[in-house]
């Protein structure tokens, strides 16, 4: 696939990620039985799942940008494999938001565009930094999901099942990236990533 075809494919991915209904390749983790949740609990859970959905929108864009500029075919293949699992996460989060009567972030086009740009830059820095960025991203997402497991209503088993499976997948992505030669990022870069993620989470929980 030449560079123009890749750009067209990325544009198509952006449209599908932001505006279409994604389809998971794996079964939905949540139990078919819905728990009895108060309106306040449902709204709270929906806001948390909206933040998680934004994270998956960003993951689609980030991996697309990284794959576009990756120099090694094996690295590109690994990024594309991770992106396929993130599509499952995207679909699960959207389904759970719908079940809770919530809505997706209104800023999803902005999130996608920003994350794609970051992914392109990460790829241009070279494969060891590209994979290192992937590993650090997944570590931070894993920690974020662990925090959401503490915040979700105790009775909301369906949301918890989704988040727990996502957490397992993110940890595996980080391990694979390191095994393929991902470098540890400098502390200032890790801090900047956490700061940007905090801004995204605070904004997405409301808008």
Curated annotation (Swiss-Prot):
Its cofactor is Fe cation. Keywords: Cell membrane, Iron, Membrane, Metal-binding, Monooxygenase, Oxidoreductase, Ubiquinone biosynthesis. The keyword Nuclease does not apply. Its EC number is 1.14.99.60. The keyword Membrane applies. It catalyses: a 5-methoxy-2-methyl-3-(all-trans-polyprenyl)benzene-1,4-diol + AH2 + O2 = a 3-demethylubiquinol + A + H2O. It comes from the Bacteria. This is 3-demethoxyubiquinol 3-hydroxylase. It comes from Thiobacillus denitrificans (strain ATCC 25259 / T1).
């Amino acid at each position: 696939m030449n560079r123009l075809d890749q750009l067209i494919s990325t544009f198509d991915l952006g449209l599908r990620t932001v505006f279409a209904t994604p389809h998971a390749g794996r079964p939905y983790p949540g139990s078919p039985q819905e728990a009895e949740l108060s309106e306040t609990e449902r709204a709270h859970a929906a806001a948390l799942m909206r933040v998680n959905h934004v994270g998956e929108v960003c993951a689609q864009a980030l991996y697309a940008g990284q794959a576009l500029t990756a120099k090694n075919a094996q690295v590109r293949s690994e990024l594309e494999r991770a992106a396929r699992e993130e599509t499952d996460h995207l679909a699960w989060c959207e389904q759970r938001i719908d079940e809770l009567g919530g809505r997706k972030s209104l800023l999803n086009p902005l999130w996608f565009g920003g994350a794609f740009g970051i992914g392109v830059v990460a790829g241009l820095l070279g494969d060891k930094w590209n994979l290192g960025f992937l590993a650090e991203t997944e570590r931070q997402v894993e920690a974020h999901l662990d925090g959401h497991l503490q915040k979700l209503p105790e009775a909301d088993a369906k949301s918890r099942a989704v988040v727990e499976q996502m957490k397992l997948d993110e940890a595996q992505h980080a391990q694979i990236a390191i095994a393929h030669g991902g470098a540890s990022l400098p502390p200032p870069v890790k801090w900047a990533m956490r700061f940007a993620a905090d801004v995204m989470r605070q904004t997405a929980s409301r808008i």
